[in-house]
Design a protein with these regions (language model features):
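Charge-biased, low-complexity intrinsically disordered regions
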Residues: 1-257
Length: 257
């Protein structure tokens, strides 16, 4: 399993770095109660935080928005998209409650304020990544590394690259875009925004690489996310979790497992 950051990334973003968690031989088919509980708890916390501190005023979110602007890329950071998705679910639940379609809750309770809606489950590994995005407000990407024959590379988009959106439709790429690539297949475009179908984690995924992109202002939090993911993955999947940290001085990771 290999991940490399092209030196050109550091030319424009010298303070860029990434936390990694690699794991091989996971069973991603079976639901995990601990991960389900984590996703629900993270959803509850994120729902409360949305009431107290909107995304627009969150310093960490602004760091990623500023990086997109600096790179000339339009997009919504992955964690912001996930938080917005949760907000939509909460709003839908509140509308249903007003219409009398759900049981009423006490006005002084937490669920009375935001409901008890959690993000829909996808599969254990994806649920873990999305829960971490909600809890820490940082982007967390999970990549299916397949048979490990292809390295994951963070680089500029090139002619011949192919990106399929979540619906499987091919979308054109801009030449200035920063992408996560497995060969010519683009898994994430616009740096840390849009996840596609290529390289996406599915229930049958066995070998996985989690990547937490960050900058100087969010580095300490990203380290906490990496350590939290490694611990939870080890507990839930029962496999060895390999962690690493990449920056301009160490821009390549090769698994030793």
């Amino acid at each position: 399993m290999k991940f490399t950051i092209d030196p050109i990334i550091f030319e424009q973003f010298p303070d860029f770095s990434a936390g990694l968690v690699a794991m091989k031989g996971i069973d991603n088919l079976v639901a995990d109660r601990d991960i389900e509980a984590f996703l629900r708890h993270a959803s509850l916390e994120a729902g409360l935080l949305l009431k107290l501190r909107p995304l627009a005023s969150d310093h960490g979110v602004r760091v990623y928005r500023d990086a997109l602007a600096k790179g000339g890329m339009d997009g919504v950071p992955a964690m912001e998209r996930v938080i917005r998705e949760l907000g939509e679910h909460i709003a839908a639940e509140q509308q249903a409650a007003l219409a009398g379609e759900t049981a009423a809750r006490g006005p002084g309770s937490v669920t009375g304020l935001i409901g008890d809606t959690a993000l829909p489950r996808i599969n254990p590994a994806c649920d873990l990544a999305r829960g971490a995005e909600l809890q820490f407000r940082l982007p967390v990407f999970a990549f299916d590394m397949g048979d490990e024959s292809e390295a994951l590379v963070l680089r500029r988009a090139e002619a011949g690259d192919r990106f399929l959106d979540a619906d499987g439709a091919e979308q054109p790429l801009g030449g200035a875009e920063i992408v996560f690539a497995l060969g010519r297949e683009i898994s994430v475009r616009r740096f840390f925004c849009d996840e596609g179908k290529l390289g996406a984690v599915v229930p049958e995924t066995r070998n996985i690489l989690m990547v937490i992109p960050c900058f100087a202002a969010t580095r300490r939090k990203a380290m906490s996310v990496r350590n939290e993911l490694a611990r939870r993955m080890k507990d839930s999947f029962g496999r060895t979790a390999e962690t690493a940290w990449l920056d301009r001085d160490t821009a390549e990771f090769v698994s030793e497992i």
